[in-house]
């Protein structure tokens, strides 16, 4: 047991050393694996039923013991049918010994380490692609390449080091924070500004309006502890403030510090940064604080969020998102000039916040005068206090009016509303979702249902009426309950007093669908009676401000919100809360490297926060749409984001800040992520070329670290700028960063899809986005934006956000020095859709899946998931045939199955040239990618052209990154050859399965054998004869062979294989599997004729079969 690896360490299958395949290893013969998707291999008989004997158990017990003692082996693999049949018993035995087990269709695996859901090394249908290019195309490409290589000796790709352009050390974003050092003579100016700030503050405080505002502020619980807070800050470097919702900590604590500094004539010398987890919080809080100080934004108080901000010469208190402060740390590790850092809402445990805390903890030792104030809305302050070495804690009680809680059983009892299997269905206006919900009783239990099952089973609800108990018995936890919410709103409006209503939902889909449902209601859709609003983090600024406005007299405000309204913002006039009890959050399955986006139950703390929103201005009521017993089963706190999301962006930031080893740095987190998640992130950054093998930033990685976006989007922008197609790539990168602009109203779904189809060509969701944006820009020039968006079911807000992000991304690229700001130079090839597709492939890699067609449709498969599906709103999801072999995709999400979002089809040439690194396979004309998952077979001269083009392209990109002044026109022959390949590759190749490569040692060993295809299991080809025969028949256009096996009187088995109206019988064998292999080997021996070389044999057999097929027709 001492040699076992830690459970969190997962070694990819192709990197493992000691696996026991079937317990009968044959060193030289290739191994045949099968998968769950091998539905074309015929097995005409079911496994014979048998019993599980004690002898089998004893045998496996010995094998497991040997595995545990063997330090080189990690797993045992069996393909025996009896082992698959008895897998449950064997798995139970393995578990008792501390082993992991998994059944992969026709393979069972027992391992020392956890096993993923899919293993490509056990799948004989992993992508193996035969690449075929027209001779004419190859000749033209080769001519360009030959000319290019002939000029390479005279080409100068680098200019002298002293003329290389230098990039600014402070980007446009960082200028918001930049505090340039002042000469000593300027100190007098700062003292004068400090006096001016003090005079201005005293004048406001003495005014009538200032006194009125002071009276309002003094009513807040936080104000009553002003002196103790300021004293604690002055006496400690770090303090933690735990303040209940409504206590005023977010608006008052930063003011206390600012007022104190200004009053002490240190105003101009102070710089206070207060981080908020969301942009809407930073903006709304800054506006409120400025208002309480009798100022306009941009005077002593300002804000900075992505894309916008307000800051003036005298701004001393700046509210910003956490990401903005992290950007500042890129150029200023010591936060020069900053006197106070306030991190608000730390209880939310966002990844950026946890990351920032690690950095600040290290910074405090270098900046002893820097003050750090951590603020939390929950009672977990001791966790943060202990992390900072026992920092002082101040508790501020909140003030809320009493709030009555009504759980689902109470709601049903007092309103007499009845739940049925049908009135709980939430109509999202999408056919697939509707159908899924209609089949709820037939579906397996979801995670939402599973986690509360025991609580529901234990509850008896005896004190409630039979009608309520019957309703509860058919309650479906997965539903939000749109119909019940509408009923509750009617009940509140008819029977309760005035006050706003805040409804907590899981995400934008819920918000938009429920809003559409309510807008057709005679009351809720009437703006003279109801002010119906949405609150979501991605909304535009002017929309967000509406939720804080007072409604007109006689109008009731109803706000549909996500968990953003729990603590980040306060809507003062809310008196009623409806809580669905769920939030949509991303979890991360590191073992399968798959993010999962599923609604999950909130924590008890979150439920309490939601309830507290109803008691800000008057006694309130909260309606929880779940039973009390379910609430009792909630976790106390939410899982930190750093433990449930992919870490590659965070790891890139760690390296860009020169924080040392990624694993070591993250081990210092408040709660460190599991080792496997860190390893997956590092592996991803190596695959995309951002890190080298020593985990140091590459040249590409340094550029990516300067771009505050997903690394794959940054890669696209960089290559788009280099290859001259930046404009469409700016649109793609911006479009993938905002909400999908294509709308699908529930009552106009067909019309919306028809409108989207106008933009959807070339089997690319990304290019459809480009065309929609370009149409919007043209409509903007003609002042017809509203009509354009209305007719094409496009979101004006999303398109505006894309437009803003495009400008920001262009500015960021300019700051890196890669472009000089002249759009014409970086858009010379902007109209080349095939080149744009190639750049998208470059950015999306390794998000790649194969497209394998069958008679009616096609199947998709990725390296880590096996079979996957497309989201229903994808253009490619509506296709029955995609004339490309590959799809690249932006992201995958596991809901029930794994779904791919935002895909673009691409050719073999595009993937080989713009995917990841390629390596030479085991023979000429064999190329590998992604650790051998992707295999390409082609003529050796074609492989040589691909390898040369790939090498030259990679060198050109590297040189351009090192020296942005490299003249791309000097490489026009290379670029012409590449454009020619990606535009004229007709995807004439085909997928093959079980394609085996014989290594030189094997070939020499075979030279003394009379037949290439041996009937013995130990001989080359014997283990794989069925696969070989199937490949030959498939190439010739036939269906797979059929095997018929009979048991002889001597207990041996004999198989007859049928294909092309031909029957061939094999020799009797000891078991059914061997008999089938022998029959297949006999068939291949019959087909191969007189050809001597292995590839000649295959060609001869294929020609023979095709001729026979033609003669038969």
UniProtKB/Swiss-Prot annotation:
Q: Where does ATP bind?
A: 243-250
InterPro entries, per the entry: DEAD-box_helicase_OB_fold (IPR011709), DEAD/DEAH_box_helicase_dom (IPR011545), dsRBD_dom (IPR014720), HA2_WH (IPR048333), Helicase-assoc_dom (IPR007502), Helicase_ATP-bd (IPR014001), Helicase_C-like (IPR001650), P-loop_NTPase (IPR027417)
Q: Which UniProt keywords apply?
A: ATP-binding, Helicase, Hydrolase, Mitochondrion, Nucleotide-binding, RNA-binding, Transit peptide
User: Which segment of this protein is annotated as the motif DEIH box?
Assistant: 344-347
Q: Where in the cell is it found?
A: Mitochondrion
Q: Which SUPFAM superfamilies match?
A: dsRNA-binding domain-like (SSF54768), P-loop containing nucleoside triphosphate hydrolases (SSF52540)
Give the Helicase ATP-binding domain ranges. 230-397
The domain of life for this entry's organism is Eukaryota
**PROSITE patterns in the record:** HELICASE_ATP_BIND_1, HELICASE_CTER
This chain belongs to which protein, by name?
DExH-box ATP-dependent RNA helicase DExH5, mitochondrial
């Amino acid at each position: 047991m001492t040699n076992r690896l830690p459970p969190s360490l997962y070694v990819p299958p192709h990197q493992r050393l000691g696996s026991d395949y079937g317990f009968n290893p044959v060193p030289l013969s290739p191994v045949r694996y099968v998968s769950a998707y091998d539905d074309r291999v015929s097995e005409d008989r079911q496994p014979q039923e048998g019993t599980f004997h004690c002898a089998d158990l004893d045998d496996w017990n010995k094998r497991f013991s040997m595995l545990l003692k063997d330090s080189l082996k990690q797993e045992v693999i069996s393909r025996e049918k009896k082992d698959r049949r008895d897998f449950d018993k064997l798995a139970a035995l393995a578990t008792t010994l501390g082993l992991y087990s998994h059944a992969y269709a026709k393979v069972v695996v027992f391992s020392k380490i956890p096993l993923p859901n899919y293993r490509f090394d056990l799948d004989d249908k992993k992508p193996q692609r035969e690449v075929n290019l027209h001779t004419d195309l190859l000749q033209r490409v080769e001519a360009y390449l030959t000319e290019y290589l002939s000029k390479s000796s005279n080409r100068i790709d680098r200019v002298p080091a002293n003329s290389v352009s230098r990039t600014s050390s402070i980007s446009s974003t960082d200028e918001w924070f930049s505090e340039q050092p002042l000469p000593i003579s300027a100190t007098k100016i700062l003292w004068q500004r400090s006096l001016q700030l003090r005079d201005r503050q005293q004048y406001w405080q003495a005014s009538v309006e200032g006194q009125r505002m002071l009276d309002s502020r003094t009513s807040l619980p936080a104000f009553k502890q002003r002196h103790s807070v300021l004293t604690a800050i002055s006496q400690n470097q770090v303090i933690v403030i735990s303040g209940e919702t409504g206590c005023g900590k977010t608006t008052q604590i930063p003011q206390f510090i600012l007022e104190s500094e200004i009053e002490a004539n240190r105003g101009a010398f102070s710089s206070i940064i207060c981080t908020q987890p969301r942009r809407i919080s930073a903006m709304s809080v800054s506006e409120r604080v400025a208002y309480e100080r009798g100022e306009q934004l941009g005077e002593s108080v300002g804000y900075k969020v992505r894309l916008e901000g307000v800051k003036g010469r005298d701004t001393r208190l700046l509210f910003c998102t956490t990401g903005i402060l992290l950007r500042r740390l890129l150029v200023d590790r010591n936060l020069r000039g900053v006197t106070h850092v306030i991190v608000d809402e730390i209880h939310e445990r966002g990844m950026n916040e946890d990351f920032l805390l690690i950095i600040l903890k290290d910074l405090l030792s270098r900046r002893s005068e820097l003050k750090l104030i951590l603020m939390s809305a929950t009672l977990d302050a001791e966790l943060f206090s202990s992390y900072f070495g026992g920092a002082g804690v101040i508790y501020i009680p909140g003030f809320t009016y009493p709030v009555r809680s009504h759980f689902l059983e109470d709601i049903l009892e007092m309103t007499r509303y009845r739940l049925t299997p049908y009135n709980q269905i939430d109509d999202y206006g999408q056919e697939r979702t509707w159908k899924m919900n209609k089949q709820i009783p037939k579906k397996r239990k979801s995670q939402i249902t599973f986690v509360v099952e025991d609580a529901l089973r234990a509850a008896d609800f005896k004190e409630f009426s039979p009608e309520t108990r019957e309703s509860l018995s058919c309650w479906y936890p997965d539903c939000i309950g749109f119909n019940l919410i509408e009923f509750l709103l009617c009940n509140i409006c008819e029977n309760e007093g005035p006050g706003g209503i805040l409804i907590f939902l899981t995400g934008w889909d819920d918000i938009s669908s429920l809003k559409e449902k309510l807008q057709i209601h005679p009351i809720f859709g009437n703006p003279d009676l109801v002010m119906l609003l949405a609150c979501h983090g991605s909304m535009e600024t002017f929309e967000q401000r509406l939720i804080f406005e007072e409604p007109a007299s006689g109008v009731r405000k109803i706000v549909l919100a996500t968990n953003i309204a729990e603590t980040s913002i306060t809507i003062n006039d809310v008196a009623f809360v409806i809580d669905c009890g769920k939030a949509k959050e991303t979890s991360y399955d590191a073992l399968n490297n798959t993010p999962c986006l599923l609604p999950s139950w909130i924590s008890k703390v979150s439920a309490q926060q939601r309830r507290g929103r109803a008691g800000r201005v008057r006694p309130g009521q909260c309606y929880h749409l779940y039973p009390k017993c379910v609430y009792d089963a909630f976790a106390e706190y939410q899982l930190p984001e750093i433990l449930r999301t992919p870490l590659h962006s965070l790891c890139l930031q760690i390296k860009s800040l020169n924080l040392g080893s990624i694993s070591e740095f993250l081990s210092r987190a408040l709660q460190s992520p599991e080792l496997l998640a860190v390893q997956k992130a590092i592996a991803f950054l190596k695959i995309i070329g951002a890190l080298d093998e020593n985990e140091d930033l590459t040249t590409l990685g340094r550029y990516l670290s300067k771009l505050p976006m997903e690394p794959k989007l940054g890669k696209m922008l960089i290559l788009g700028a280099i290859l001259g197609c930046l404009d469409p790539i700016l649109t793609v990168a911006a479009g993938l960063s905002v909400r999908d602009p294509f709308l699908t109203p529930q009552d106009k779904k067909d019309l919306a899809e028809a409108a989207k189809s106008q933009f959807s060509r070339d089997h690319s969701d990304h290019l459809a986005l480009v065309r929609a944006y370009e149409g919007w820009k043209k409509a903007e020039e003609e002042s017809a934006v509203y009509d354009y968006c209305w007719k094409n079911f496009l979101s004006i807000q999303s398109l505006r956000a894309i437009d803003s992000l495009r400008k920001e991304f262009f500015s960021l690229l300019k700051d890196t020095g890669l472009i000089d700001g002249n759009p014409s130079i970086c858009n010379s090839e902007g109209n080349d859709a095939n080149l744009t597709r190639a750049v998208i492939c470059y950015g999306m890699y390794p998000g790649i899946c194969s497209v394998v067609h069958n008679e009616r449709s096609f199947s998709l498969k990725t390296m880590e998931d096996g079979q996957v599906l497309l989201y229903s709103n994808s253009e490619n999801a509506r296709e029955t045939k995609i004339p490309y072999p590959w799809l690249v995709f932006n992201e995958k999400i596991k809901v029930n199955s794994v779904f791919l979002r935002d895909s673009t089809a691409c050719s073999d040439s595009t993937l080989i040239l713009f995917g990841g690194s390629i390596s030479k396979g085991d023979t000429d004309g064999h190329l590998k990618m992604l650790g051998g998952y992707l295999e390409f077979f082609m003529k050796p001269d074609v492989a040589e052209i691909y390898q040369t083009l790939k090498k030259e392209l990679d060198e050109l990109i590297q040189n351009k990154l090192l020296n942005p002044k490299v003249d791309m026109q000097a490489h026009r022959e290379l670029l012409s050859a590449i454009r020619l390949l990606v535009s004229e590759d007709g995807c004439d190749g085909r997928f093959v399965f079980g394609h085996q490569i014989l290594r030189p040692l094997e070939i020499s060993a075979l030279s003394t054998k009379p037949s290439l295809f041996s009937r013995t299991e130990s001989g080359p080809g014997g283990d794989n004869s069925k696969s070989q025969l199937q490949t030959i028949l498939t190439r010739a256009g036939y269906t797979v062979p059929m095997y018929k096996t009979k048991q002889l009187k001597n207990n041996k088995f004999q198989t007859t294989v049928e294909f092309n109206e031909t029957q061939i019988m094999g020799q009797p064998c000891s078991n059914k599997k061997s008999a089938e292999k022998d029959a297949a080997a006999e068939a291949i021996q019959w087909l191969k004729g007189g050809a001597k070389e292995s590839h000649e044999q295959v060609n001869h057999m294929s020609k023979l079969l095709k001729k026979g097929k033609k003669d038969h027709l």
